UniProtKB/Swiss-Prot annotation:
Residues 207-210 are annotated as: G4 motif. This is Neuronal-specific septin-3. Residues 1-10 have a biased composition (Basic and acidic residues). InterPro entries: G_SEPTIN_dom, P-loop_NTPase, Septin, Septin3. Gene3D superfamilies: P-loop containing nucleotide triphosphate hydrolases. The lineage of its organism: Eukaryota, Metazoa, Chordata, Craniata, Vertebrata. The modification Phosphoserine is found at S91. The gene is SEPTIN3. Residues 125-128 are annotated as: G3 motif. Residues 1-29 are annotated as: Disordered.
């Protein structure tokens, strides 16, 4: 080796002397809530507009069931709720000849459009409920119908050739009409709500509230709430499904006001220079949307304006999922039928349920 020149080393020797580089520490993630303007606009807020456009284009399903004895104004109230003739009143009949011998299920579909949004509404009526001398187990055909709609949706969901949007016939809401006796709930009322509250969103309402004084109405509402609590019956909105403190605060106010004491009417009258929906009595006009007269406006706002989407989500994520899990556990597999997947079911999405084509 020549003098004055540094000694050279081979690559192998160098690798022994130079240590392996240490891995770089992970770069900490930016904290949530950072100002997006510092990094540039992402566009995640457009999801709201995307959902709006899709809803405007396809519309959405809403299926409401009405249950109660005849003569409680079920059809009138539903027509008042949606300001349309969406439920047909039963024609006058000879009671001995025309009253159904068993509970019937009648579904009537309508499309209601408002502000460019289409709602595919189905009203499910239950003539014959509670009208017999012996009403034992008269809730069973109603529970059977509700479960049949879950089964229909389940079979579509696991089908290989499933549709992009599965037609949704599941019952999202059941209005249960309580007779305005002013005393207590009947055994039939308790039996129905005890069984059906496990499979559908039940909203109890006191029918024909104009037949009671304000004091009678207040006392009856408190008595009904107490009886439901004592019998372990939870109506919608269920406490266990409150998602946060804001939900709980809002829903507690609603639960304290239930059951809503309502009056329905499709007739208009002139009151103080304004046309209002109401019922004419010897004492004056009962205004349907006047909270001093009845609680129809509270029911309408609750079902349509604030909780409609939640009714659909609880149906899909709670009631349907409960049926789905039980159905598969009981049978040890998928429901029978052609073209069904032989593998594990896809997970239920935590999103609003699909709408009909």
């Amino acid at each position: 080796m020549s003098k004055g020149l540094p000694e050279t080393r081979t690559d192998a020797a160098m690798s022994e002397l130079v240590p392996e580089p240490r891995p770089k520490p992970a770069v900490p993630m930016k904290p949530i809530g950072i100002n997006p303007n510092l990094l540039g606009y992402i566009g995640i807020d457009t999801i709201i507009e995307q959902m709006r456009k899709k809803t405007m284009k396809t519309g959405f399903d809403f299926n409401i069931m009405v249950v109660g004895q005849s003569g409680l104004g079920k059809s009138t109230l539903v027509n008042t709720l949606f300001k349309s003739q969406v439920s047909r009143k039963a024609s006058s009949w000879n009671r001995e000849e025309k009253i159904p011998k068993t509970v019937e299920i009648k579904a009537i579909g309508h499309v209601i459009e408002e502000g460019g949004v289409k709602m595919k509404l189905t009203v499910i009526d239950t003539p014959g409920f509670g009208d017999q001398i012996n009403n034992e187990n008269c809730w069973e055909p109603i529970e059977k119908y509700i479960n049949e709609q879950y089964e229909k949706f389940l079979k579509e969901e696991v089908n290989i050739a499933r549709k992009k949007r599965i037609p949704d016939t599941r019952v999202h809401c059941c209005l249960y009409f309580i007779s305005p006796t002013g005393h207590s709930l009947r055994p039939l009322d308790l039996e129905f709500m005890k069984h059906l509250s496990k499979v559908v969103n039940i909203i109890p309402v006191i029918a024909k509230a104009d037949t009671m004084t304000l004091e009678e109405k207040s006392e009856f509402k408190q008595r009904v709430r107490k009886e439901l609590e004592v019998n372990g019956i939870e109506f919608y909105p269920q406490k266990e499904f409150d998602e946060d403190l804001e939900d709980k605060t809002e829903n507690d106010k609603i639960r304290e006001s239930m059951p809503f004491a309502v009056v329905g009417s499709d007739k208009e009258y002139q009151v103080n220079g304004k046309r209002v929906l109401g019922r004419k009595t010897p004492w004056g006009i009962i205004e349907v949307e006047n909270l001093n007269h009845c609680e129809f406006a509270l029911l309408r706002d609750f079902v349509i304006r604030t909780h409609l989407q939640d009714l659909k989500e609880v149906t899909h994520n709670i009631h349907y999922e409960t049926y789905r899990a039980k159905r598969l556990n009981d049978n040890g597999g998928l429901p029978p039928g052609e073209g069904l997947l032989g593998t594990v079911l896809p997970p239920v999405p935590a999103t609003p349920c699909p709408t009909a084509e």
